[in-house]
Amino acid sequence: MPRVDLADLPLRRTLPFMRAPGPQERTASRVGIVGVPFDCGAHPLRVGARLGPSAIREQSQLLRPFNPPDFDFDPLAKLQVADWGDVDVVPGQIEDAFAKIERVLDTLYASGALPLTMGGDGAGTLPQIRAAHRKFPDLVALHLDSHADSNPFPETGHDTGTAFTRAAQEGLVDVAHSMHAGIRGTFRMQGSLEHSDKLGYETILMRDIEKMGISGLIERLRAKCGARPVYLCFDMDVFDPSCAPGVCAPSWGGLTAREGLAILRGIGGLNIVAMDVNTISPPHDVGGMSALLAANVMLEGMLLFAQRPQ
């Protein structure tokens, strides 16, 4: 793999995730970490996801690479993980930010690596799916969230609840093999779930997970995606606020930390080609606990990349 020149990309250097080196220091990087410090700035009460990457990076310094007996190897070394820094975006400037995100990820894919990103709010998922689709045209989506983000979109443009609406309408994912899981709580408009169904997505509510159990959910997820290339979107508000209070739209009755991490362990071997972890809002966190959990989710994401079929 050629060494990557970041000079012409809209990136800014920041604290490396788990002290990972930059791409210039790797010769065969399989995973590139990218921060997406963007939010629409439109949430009526909880603006702050733009600060998510910096908080996750800070908490990642507490993590250690070895976790026996589950994995007794260093995933950063095995995958030659490189930290590309943060995309240089201005929150609220949607079209400009989306173009920059796509440009960075297109370059990352061209380098031979796969992206592991941290946001940022859910609006930033759309440009990432666009870039993934260009690399993997038969892409499917696995979306863990308390909201389906498949609302009817406003004529004025994008918002945090429409990323998967646009992904379906732009033909970026095969909706027949894509799924939302963990959905619960209140919605700001009537018919949100019905609209997601009309788009073709399968939706598993949190109440369904309570009945089938985590092992049952894992079976459903694996069967849905099969051997297809998977875009894994992990919205941190899929967790209960008791373990992840620092998110944009908390909703009680979610996954415990143990359950969420077990799901990630359970889908090992799927063909994960991109993962984004989003919606951490540091101003609403408690002692950095949500950001630390997000950093752990990203570490589990590295294991998923290590287990994907070659």
Language-model features: locations:
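Conserved alpha-helical scaffold segments that buttress catalytic/binding sites
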Residues: 2-310
